[in-house]
Structures are given as structure tokens and as C-alpha cells.
């Protein structure tokens, strides 16, 4: 083994779970080549920052992380700073010029070559850039080092996006939508489950588009059936399901497949037709309202999550009032709100009637306040119910309390359950009775068998 391969590597992954999978692939490739992976950035010879560039706040977070870690080159062990992902894919020349502390820039199409690129850099001293066409798609033969807790993992079922939302830069950063083959996904899922994973969370830019670019009859529902046949897999969770792609077949599967969590993340972005049309979304207000009502009616107890954008160009006072009233009526269990970010190169950036930052922030505050009331009522209604909870560790406040998630809660983005009684191993799925609630979290007692 070369001295290069004995170096320690640390990874900082920013942004969404899809980014996290890319980071895990890079770590897997490096570990396979003999690099030692460390969680301690102070020990690392090589630090990789896997960046997000979706909106302004994500870019700022990425740049702040890069600048912070650049200091490690002067006061720590770090000799090589790598910036990967969406930020260099979008701003390679600017980063190379403004951040000379960065040694390597890797775009979204070159993750599997990370070890090769490091070797090339160490053979010379110059800053190097690998930012080509974003045509990479994860292959199951690539090693992947799961950085999530061992009982759950994200399964990236496709790459890129073929939607044409006027506010979004993702298609230019990730390319058109490409589905991964069913057999490849099943093979990866089986490997993850064999390693102890009990919950698979399906992700891509638009999971309902899965199979639409393939010549066979592959579909999201068909993929779920194949995954559900894996013996020791307990939960399958769906994130990023576009409303216009939710099929009758998928709705039926929620009724019949016990491993499919009664949970659906549907990013609708807005409800007013005026805004939806300017966003170039494919669903209308009537279609969205009909879908939400149908899901509530046909799948009793389903947990619905969505994301919304406030302050989009041309959003009027009436549009925002309509959105607020819709949030009250739809009663989403979970909801995220983003202020519109004016992204260079997108059609929306050139639209008239841009909304001021002050108005955006005020609308964000009002909508989150509305949702807090909804969430409190939804959680309060769960008191007295029995739920299956996956145990994830001890509470930050005291080791006398366990914490976990019900099947109604996704990792990181939803609340937690604090378990006040009983004993279980981390990763166990146990029955708990909900005894109390807050806006976003639950309290429960374990039901002893």
C-alpha cells in the first residue's frame, strides 16, 4: 500500500440526502483504495466538502464551510482540501479564482474518480478542476460507505431532473432524469439490509418519475414490491414524490404493502394557479386539492409532508392568503417553507414583480406560525395511540430517556419520540404508547411484552 493510500480522509456533506449518498460513494471508493476514513477533521490529511448550490442559503453554508476548513491547512493536519458537488459544477472558475486554498474541484459527474483525482493532484502541486458534463449515475458495483446510523439508509433510485421548474438550477447541475435499473437497486438494498439496515428511504429529484426513461415497464410501485420482498427489511419510506406522478397503482400499494410507511412527502411548492403556472409546475390548484383529499380518504392515517416557496415573483397578497388558508385546511403533518431564491440563469430570475426580501421573510414567518398550530393539533391527536418506534439512541438531555422515530417521522427533517420507560437496543423497533406531544415531538412509554 502506498503512503498516499494510508492518508486519513474526512468528509463534510452538506445539503440533501441525495448529496449524502454521493458523499458515501466517494468515501467508499477511497476506503477501497486504502485511505483511512476519520470523523475528526483535525486528524485528516484530506478534507472533502460535498457542497449544495440549490439556493442562496445553501451556497452561503457551503462557502462558510470551505473557509472554515481552509484554516485547517494552516493550523491542522490537512494538506489537501477538496470541494465537490453542485457548487463547483456551477461556479468552478469563480471558486478557483476566489478560493486558492482549495486544491481540487470535483463536479457532480466525477465522484467515482475521487481516488484517481487525488493521486493526480499529489503527483503535482497545481490546483486541478474536474468539472465535466453531469452524466454520472451511481452504479451498485461502486463501493459505498453508509454514514447514516446503521439501521437506516437512503436508496438513490435515480439521478438528475427533467422537470422544467422556472426557479430551479438542478437540471443544469445534475442533467436529465436517469433511472437506475431495478436489479441494481434490489442488489444494493439487499447488501444494505444484510449490513443491518431496517429502513430504506427512497430518494431522487422526483421519485414518481422513476422508470419513465426506461424501455421496460419499470415503475415506482413495481420497485417497491421488489424491495418489500427483502426479508429483514422493515420500513420503506418515500421522499420527493411529485403530485402529478402519484399513480393509482402507488395509492393501492399504500393500502396493501405493510412495509411501505404510511408517509408521503409531496413537494407542491404553492397552491395558487397564478404562482404554479409561473413556476411551470405541472399540477393545478384543483388537481392538488383533489389529490390531498383522495389520499386522506383512501389511506386512513397517512402522514403527509410538503415543501412550499413564498415570495415567488408575482405572488400577490391574495396568492399568499390562498396558500395560508390551504395550509390550514390541508392539515399537513409536516411542512417546510423556503423563501424564494433568485437564481442566476433561471427564467424566474428575469421575471417582473420580484418580491422584496422583507416581504418574503414576513410571509415565511406567518406560514410557519400557521403550520406550528396545525402540527400541534396533529400531534395532540396522536396521544393515546400505539405506534411502532425505531430506537435511535439516548436523549441529548439525559441518558435516562431513549429517543426514536415512528414510521410517521423521517430522519432529520421531522420530529422525534422521547421514550420515558422500557429497555431496548438501538435499532430495535418497539411498540410505544404516545403519552404527550409538542409542536413537533412526541413523548411515549414503551409497551412491555
UniProtKB/Swiss-Prot annotation:
Cofactor annotation remark: Binds 2 [4Fe-4S] clusters. One cluster is coordinated with 3 cysteines and an exchangeable S-adenosyl-L-methionine.
PROSITE patterns: MTTASE_N, MTTASE_RADICAL, RADICAL_SAM, TRAM
Family matches, as Gene3D superfamilies: Methylthiotransferase, N-terminal domain, Nucleic acid-binding proteins, tm_1862 like domain
Domain TRAM: 380-448
Sorted UniProt keywords: 4Fe-4S, Cytoplasm, Iron, Iron-sulfur, Metal-binding, S-adenosyl-L-methionine, Transferase
SUPFAM superfamilies (alphabetical): Radical SAM enzymes
E.C. no: 2.8.4.4
InterPro entries in alphabetical order: Elp3/MiaA/NifB-like_rSAM, Methylthiotransferase, Methylthiotransferase_CS, Methylthiotransferase_N, Methylthiotransferase_N_sf, NA-bd_OB-fold, Ribosomal_uS12_MeSTrfase_RimO, rSAM
Disulfide bonds: none
Reaction(s) this enzyme catalyzes, per UniProt: L-aspartate(89)-[ribosomal protein uS12]-hydrogen + (sulfur carrier)-SH + AH2 + 2 S-adenosyl-L-methionine = 3-methylsulfanyl-L-aspartate(89)-[ribosomal protein uS12]-hydrogen + (sulfur carrier)-H + 5'-deoxyadenosine + L-methionine + A + S-adenosyl-L-homocysteine + 2 H(+)
Role played: Catalyzes the methylthiolation of an aspartic acid residue of ribosomal protein uS12.
Name this protein carries in UniProt: Ribosomal protein uS12 methylthiotransferase RimO
Lineage, opening ranks: Bacteria, Pseudomonadati, Thermodesulfobacteriota, Desulfuromonadia, Geobacterales
Amino acid at each position: 500500500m502506498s503512503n498516499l493510500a494510508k492518508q486519513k480522509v474526512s468528509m463534510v456533506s452538506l445539503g440533501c440526502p441525495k448529496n449524502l449518498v454521493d458523499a458515501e460513494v466517494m468515501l467508499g471508493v477511497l476506503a477501497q483504495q486504502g485511505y483511512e476514513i476519520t470523523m475528526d477533521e483535525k486528524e485528516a490529511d484530506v478534507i472533502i466538502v460535498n457542497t449544495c448550490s440549490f439556493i442562496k442559503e445553501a451556497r452561503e453554508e457551503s462557502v462558510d464551510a470551505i473557509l472554515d476548513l481552509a484554516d485547517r491547512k494552516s493550523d491542522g493536519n490537512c494538506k489537501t482540501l477538496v470541494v465537490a458537488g453542485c457548487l463547483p459544477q456551477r461556479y468552478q472558475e469563480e471558486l478557483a479564482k476566489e478560493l486558492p486554498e482549495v486544491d481540487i474541484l470535483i463536479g457532480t459527474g466525477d465522484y467515482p474518480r475521487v481516488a484517481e483525482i487525488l493521486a493526480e493532484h499529489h503527483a503535482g502541486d497545481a490546483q486541478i478542476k474536474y468539472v465535466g458534463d453531469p452524466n454520472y449515475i451511481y452504479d451498485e458495483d461502486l463501493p459505498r460507505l453508509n454514514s447514516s446510523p446503521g439501521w437506516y439508509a437512503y436508496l438513490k433510485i435515480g439521478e438528475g431532473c427533467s422537470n422544467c421548474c422556472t426557479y430551479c438550477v438542478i437540471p443544469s447541475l445534475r442533467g436529465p432524469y436517469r433511472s437506475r435499473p431495478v436489479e441494481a437497486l434490489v442488489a444494493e438494498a439487499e447488501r444494505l439490509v444484510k449490513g443491518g439496515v431496517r429502513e430504506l428511504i427512497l430518494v431522487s429529484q422526483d421519485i414518481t418519475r422513476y422508470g419513465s426513461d426506461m424501455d421496460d415497464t419499470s415503475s415506482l410501485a413495481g420497485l417497491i414490491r421488489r424491495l418489500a420482498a427483502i426479508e429483514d427489511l422493515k420500513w420503506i419510506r418515500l421522499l420527493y414524490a411529485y403530485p402529478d406522478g402519484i399513480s393509482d397503482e402507488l395509492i393501492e400499494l399504500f393500502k396493501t404493502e405493510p412495509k411501505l410507511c404510511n408517509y408521503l412527502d409531496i413537494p407542491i411548492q404553492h397552491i395558487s394557479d397564478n404562482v404554479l403556472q409561473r413556476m411551470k409546475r405541472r399540477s393545478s390548484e384543483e388537481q392538488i386539492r383533489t389529490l390531498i383529499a383522495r389520499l386522506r380518504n383512501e389511506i386512513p392515517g397517512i402522514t403527509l409532508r410538503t415543501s412550499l416557496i413564498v415570495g415567488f415573483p408575482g405572488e400577490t397578497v391574495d396568492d399568499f392568503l390562498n396558500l395560508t388558508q390551504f395550509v390550514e385546511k390541508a392539515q399537513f403533518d409536516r411542512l417546510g417553507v423556503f423563501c424564494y431564491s433568485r437564481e442566476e440563469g433561471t427564467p424566474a430570475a428575469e421575471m417582473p414583480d420580484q418580491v422584496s426580501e422583507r416581504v418574503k421573510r414576513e410571509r415565511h414567518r406567518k406560514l410557519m406560525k400557521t403550520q406550528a398550530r396545525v402540527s400541534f393539533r396533529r400531534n395532540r391527536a396522536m396521544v393515546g395511540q400505539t405506534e411502532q418506534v425505531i430506537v435511535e439512541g439516548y436523549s441529548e438531555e439525559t441518558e435516562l430517556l431513549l429517543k426514536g422515530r415512528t414510521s410517521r417521522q423521517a430522519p432529520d427533517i421531522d420530529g422525534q419520540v422521547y421514550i420515558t420507560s422500557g429497555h431496548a437496543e438501538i435499532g430495535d423497533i418497539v411498540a410505544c404508547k404516545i403519552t404527550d406531544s409538542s409542536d413537533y415531538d412526541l413523548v411515549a412509554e414503551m409497551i412491555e411484552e
